[in-house]
Regions:
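Juxtamembrane boundary at the C-terminal end of a transmembrane helix
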Residues: 284-292
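Interfacial loop-to-transmembrane junctions
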Residues: 251-275
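Active-site catalytic microenvironments for nucleophilic, acid-base chemistry
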Residues: 199, 203, 252, 287
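Hydrophobic, small-residue-rich transmembrane alpha-helices and their short perimembrane loops
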Residues: 238-239
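Membrane-embedded alpha-helical bundles of polytopic integral membrane proteins
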Residues: 1-233
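C-terminal-most transmembrane helix of multi-pass membrane proteins
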Residues: 278-279
Length: 292
């Protein structure tokens, strides 16, 4: 009972933080979201680094954190000053930092190639992946608000629907070797939840509230509704894949949670594992719509 109470309180606090960040971003200033995502990237990198260190050579964390910070600076300068692709600029920083890492490892007596591989892994997951979430904030209106809201609606809806449908119907396991509690019925429920979230946001975009917070059409005519629903579906798939990938890492290194930072909920990565993959899918989908 005490654990349930702790989980509810922490869950409520997380919800309030998410809503506050979204509203401050959409109604006040874009920097709130940038700072939030950078904090997730740094916190997530520390957790993943600590996790894989339990079984594999320890990543060079200072280089990972430097990649996150310098990559963010390059991203913002590219988007706001030079007016070129932020994602491209970020990955240029990643490439430079990888070269610096190789030189550093070659000159070190304590580190070897395995440390370099571990470091590069954390550079990509979760740091580079979360830069796509950062990318939402620098999309043109109304894609910016739509993308942010889709991510923070679809992923939670997927998790909630998957939990309740899976707990109720049970049935055959989805990936018992990776996550014994996940069922096929739960996965289907999650897909329904993500699709419902996309549909609800479509209807919200048609209201005065949606207009007030910066939402709008993703495309013209009937295809607008279809795109909201399709993003909900594919982002739900990505959310569940991200969840399984995080579970795979935790099982490989023999841990239950990435940390105990969030009482009853584990660590940062335990809360955003699905979002890490979903943000990539949503960003690419919306980028294609913008290019059309």
């Amino acid at each position: 009972m005490k654990d349930i109470k702790k989980r509810i309180i922490t869950g409520g606090a997380i919800f309030v933080v998410f809503v506050a960040v979204i509203l401050l971003t959409l109604l006040v200033h874009w920097t709130f979201f940038d700072v939030f995502v950078l904090a997730l990237a740094v916190g997530g990198a520390i957790e993943v680094s600590n996790a894989i260190s339990k079984r594999f050579p320890r990543p060079v964390l200072p280089i990972v954190l430097a990649t996150a910070v310098l990559g963010y600076v390059a991203y913002v300068l590219a988007q706001k000053v030079v007016k070129i692709g932020g994602i491209t600029s970020f990955f240029c920083v990643v490439l430079v930092m990888c070269l610096a890492l190789i030189v550093y490892v070659m000159c070190s007596k304590k580190l070897n190639t395995n440390n370099a591989v571990s470091t590069m892994f954390v550079m990509i997951y979760p740091v580079a992946a979360l830069m796509y979430m950062l990318g939402f904030n620098h999309l043109p209106d109304p894609y910016r608000a739509n993308a942010i809201l889709l991510l923070f609606a679809v992923s939670p809806f997927t998790d909630v629907f998957a939990f309740f449908v899976g707990s109720t119907l049970k049935g055959k396991k989805l990936c018992p070797k990776i996550s014994p509690n996940k069922t096929i019925s739960g996965a289907i429920g999650g897909l329904i939840g993500g699709t419902v979230a996309g549909a609800l946001l479509y209807f919200l975009s048609l209201t005065s509230v949606g207009e007030f917070i910066g939402m709008g059409a993703l495309s013209a005519g009937v295809s607008n509704c279809i795109n909201f629903i399709c993003i909900g579906f594919v982002a739900s798939v990505a959310t569940q894949v991200g969840d399984l990938f995080a579970s795979f890492i935790k099982r490989a290194v023999g841990i239950k949670d990435y940390s105990n930072l969030l009482p009853g909920h584990g660590g940062i990565m335990d809360r955003i594992d699905g979002m890490v993959f979903a943000c990539i899918v949503i960003y690419l989908y919306v980028a294609i719509l913008i290019a059309l």
